[in-house]
């Protein structure tokens, strides 16, 4: 065979595939080796390598980039003149650079072909040996546009290539994309690996177990297209499939049912027919497997698939492996960069254009801001050549196409005639926004712009441009006024540099004594103060901490409770008297006599309002909280001081013990000191519980009480006794004395003092649980601030200061109320606010009245000019404007101008005969001079605003440079599929709802589309039986159907991704009434299956990856095989159970024979994770996810695992039922321990090697001839078998081993009798079902 052509990568692939198909792998690999040697030999001879000289930049590049830049300069000027909006400018820039980059790429290729076809770079890239076009483009073309981290395209392209070298800016821009690529790759590997794992899990039990299931069902295959482009031709999709019925063309049978299509037949059928019915794993009726005929070829060999082939795992790997190559991320290009699918039509020759009748057009504004004619209904244009030898050409135009020529226009060769939009591609658009910021400071003026206020439901008002127009910024210097500043000039004033424009006053609210530290930013004003003039403060340190002690004139000592230099609130405690008059030695009980206290808190203590006596009955309380077994004494026992009451706890005083316990936990031990008398009775002695016994009371003739006691009857281990407990008395004065204090300048009606307060910490009758002792009463100095206006007191604080006393080493305590005022910092060069100067108007030590001005901040003018833009009243704005000479320019004219004062002039507009304005501006005045005229203009800048834009500013507002002016709202084509690549594959296979699902028609009918004013669209469908269904649309959804259009069931009415669950539901509900549940479920599942297969294919195709349909079909089959039981009827099935559709239908058929009620069900679509967890085998499900849940459920339900898949068998450690282990699986499919006697040792029934024709099939002719290089895969069993040329007699012990392996394969002792007869897998299934029912 002789080919005379250049062999590149593609041709090489085909050559090797042909050799493999025809001559097997051994010869093919030998040929591949020889080809490799050939390649290397000639590459070495030729010296193919890349050097810098090979990277030739096409000479036309410079000129191409210059023309692109020229086009962009024009666009920029149009933008500056206000002819196009920011969005249109951006779009034009992006499109210009894109087309330049593309045409440069073509130029690179042309340049190589013409000048140096043997260039190493060119040869490598185009033969497919190394590199690709996009890399070559970056080496010698231009790198093109890049996206920023948010995915928006940066409108600064990288014009250089790697051969010329990048500038710093370009390098930084391009590093965004590079980093993104690396991160993406890292994320992709993990994602794709997990996807493969889930796919394997869901399909691992799909094994070819039958030769032919005999089904009559089929799927229809057509070529896969995207718009006009054919992604996968029909011939490619047919290869290796079995036909479902004979193909007859013009009465001739081209191919028959069940024929597997090879290359030739596929080519032939692809030419002759558009759609073809084939068998598919989706429709295969083999139970829990796929049959050979439905699967077709094993694509690895180009022969029918072998029995026992694990096609599920092959499918999973075929889909999972390319996952890494899919792009992960959505490059959302900030959208303006559209994937507009418009075909450009250029004139092939010079000629005249004619519009044919029936072509209806209307004028539109294109996305570049140009006015063009757009085609409304399909029509045609005709091009008549100037050269009569050529033929007239007619072009058909689709609606939405743009015309670049007029009727009757003469066109030159290669002139652009029209951009034809593809009618197949549904143009889905979405709303997007873009901010426009101001390029100069000044005031705002609207021209032809009509604003309109809209209020939404929340009551927020937005201002929207009702009609588009120009928004002008008239130049001027804008000053931002600080808060509180009042302008001291008015509109129209002329100001010079350094004049004060506005000022802020700093006012003291309270007045008082001024304290001003040098170089400080704060002015402190003392409004009131108090000092302890007779007391000294000394610093003493105890336990390593400094303490401030106040010694008063009358010998009292106070401890300062706050640190000097800090602020204290009103009513805060400043100091506490040091005294131990009210200190107890242990805990005890407290009783008030004549004492009255004010309300207060436990933490602060209760203030004593009236003096009296405190009675204190001491007792020692140990809080223990230990086990009762540690107790060393008994309840009621008398203990001596120092005795151990609980392990490691000793009492300090003698007395009677009271034990408090709860639930065998020892809570408290109380030791009550006192005198214990045992020989008294309560009745005879007349002493009540808790009675006070006064001194001199005679208890018995021998005993007289010396001091005050409290009586308590206690139970001891010797009987009832009387305990007389000691009582301490503490006398409390009505009020304590305050140290003398002098106060100064109590201005503004304020008064400040330190008040002495006695506070008691325990309530009347309270028990103090303690061993040590406590302070009962404390005397405190409290800060009291009072004022004529009580509400102004709450926020006042006082500062604690220590003033040194002359010629003594101690200090005096002083409390002052300060008002602190902070001065503004001066700034000479605030770019937005003028020069700011602050002047202080007071001196240190001044006395000032309330309301006095302490300092004044002035905003000074930086440039001479006229004041504008001050507003009064409610409209007051914190800005003012100065129009200086820099903002104006003068044009001398020789002729009379055509403009008058206040006119707005756009750059390059005519202002007098033959005179164009150099800049845009507003005419201030037109003056006549000796030589002619003089126009004075104020610089200005127009911005084009499209209708519907959101305005951030109003007419007359003052804006700084960089302020937002408007938010342009525009429609952009959704860039491709917003979710691409892996995430989309995952969304499909996990059967997730898409984010913005489209609306599907539930019944066929005729559409009625109504557009309401507020951009809301109503779609109603008049169904065939006359019912009208309404389909509500969300705001973001655009209708895809037009008024009076006929629609079919399940058709998408709006843009967006279809939700597969909804497809299933819509079709099932539509068919169920006419066809019954089973057929409806099959039909609905088929629609969903085809949708999923096509969607997955299109994602892989968009990345240029080819996957055979059958792999996806195997996976989708696993996702769509189950139904959910709605009502079990008379069967044993439970509502909500997920079961195989065929299994349910078998039971229902049995029910219809016996007359029982059939089960009702709905088909369900399970994502791959869900399907893996709902598989028949609980071992497989448990080893995938949620192990504990799966195993506990299986245990509760008493499930059996039939060990059909690969995974279950691997886990349990047996042969897998695929490949070489398939036969043993088949023959033992129902074997119990019972074996028929005549077969006992006849192992010839079971061959231990696989003939090359595939297991279970007759061997290939010529098998065993050495003449043919057969492809064989040997394992040790097969090898032994081959060695003798026949099946070997195995040793007895090996036989025993094998037979034990064989019989244990399905050893089910408890129900063995049921299985002894069952030999076929199908029967086994029926048994399993019957068994489950019973």
From Swiss-Prot:
One of its GO terms (cellular component) is DNA-directed RNA polymerase complex. Gene3D superfamilies: 1.10.132.30, 1.10.150.390, 1.10.1790.20, 2.40.50.100, RNA polymerase Rpb1, domain 3 (1.10.274.100). Its cofactor is Zn(2+). Zn(2+) binds at residues 213, 284, 291, 294. It comes from the Bacteria. The keyword Transcription applies. Residues 1299-1334 are annotated as: Disordered. This is DNA-directed RNA polymerase subunit beta'. It comes from Microcystis aeruginosa (strain NIES-843 / IAM M-2473). The gene is rpoC2.
